A protein has these predicted regions:
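An N-terminal alpha-helical hairpin/helix-loop-helix interaction module that forms a charged
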Residues: 1-132, 148-235
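Contiguous, well-ordered alpha-helical segments that form the cores/surfaces of helical PPI scaffolds
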Residues: 139-146
């Protein structure tokens, strides 16, 4: 790995920290989204909700993290859960969120099983609604919302470009060749580099109010560095 390139990207992230978190860009929304999900998902109050209602309430702060003008995966989950509540809930609780004891290969297998299963639900319930489709970015975002200390959000283009720029040296892969352990390994290296940046961490904690998830693992911050490097052309 090219440590100098990694540190340069983190420095550019730090130099632009106030700008990317201003009212226009508001990248800190990711921490609000996780806090919202955690507060809803693990609350006793949701016991009386349907799964569709629970998921909708939990993801209401996700904003552009998953949805945009072309796709609406979170709304898709809600709509599919209204049609097949038991199956959609099973796919989340017993498959995607299943305890894997830290086994990343098993976690990746669970993700693929979840995606196959939820696509089958979509084909049965909304066959012409491609915007309700789910992908790895969706699945790993749901995992990061559910267990942020153990997971990283994943986006293919951002991960590939970051890995190339820091000369990671391990192929993350894509499609059938995707390797979760390789991606998480790269993110772990970003976390290690962030932990020795006290000035940046101080800036970050200063804007993390009560409405934000307190990311002790720095997993969200690591993804934010990877994401913002591409989104704001730090390369």
């Amino acid at each position: 790995m090219n440590t100098a390139n990694l540190n340069t990207l983190i420095q550019r992230y730090e130099d632009n920290f106030e700008w990317i978190n201003n009212a226009e860009h508001d990248e800190i929304f990711k921490w609000r989204a996780v806090r919202c999900f955690q507060d809803v998902w693990f609350s006793e109050e949701v016991e009386d909700m349907t799964f569709a209602e629970k998921f909708k309430a939990a993801t209401k702060e996700c904003s552009v993290l998953l949805d945009n003008g072309q796709v609406s995966p979170t709304n898709g989950i809600v709509k599919m859960a209204e049609q097949e509540p038991d199956e959609v809930e099973r796919l989340f609780v017993e498959v995607l969120f299943a305890d894997d004891q830290g086994n990343l290969q098993l976690r990746q297998d669970h993700v693929e099983e979840f995606l196959d299963g939820i696509e089958a639900v979509r084909e049965r319930t909304f066959p012409s609604y491609w915007k309700y489709g789910q992908n790895r970015h969706c699945a790993f975002t749901y995992l990061a919302l559910y267990a942020p200390e153990e997971n990283y959000i994943y986006k293919y283009s951002e991960a590939e470009e970051f890995a190339k720029h820091i000369e990671y040296g391990i192929d993350i892969g894509s499609g059938q060749t995707f390797k979760l352990s390789a991606y998480y390994g790269m993110c772990d290296l970003v976390v290690d580099a962030l932990r020795i940046r006290p000035a940046l961490l101080e800036k970050h904690w200063a804007i993390c109010g009560d409405e934000c998830y307190h990311d002790d693992s720095l997993h969200l911050l690591a993804f934010d560095v990877i994401y913002c490097s591409r989104a704001y052309n730090f390369y």
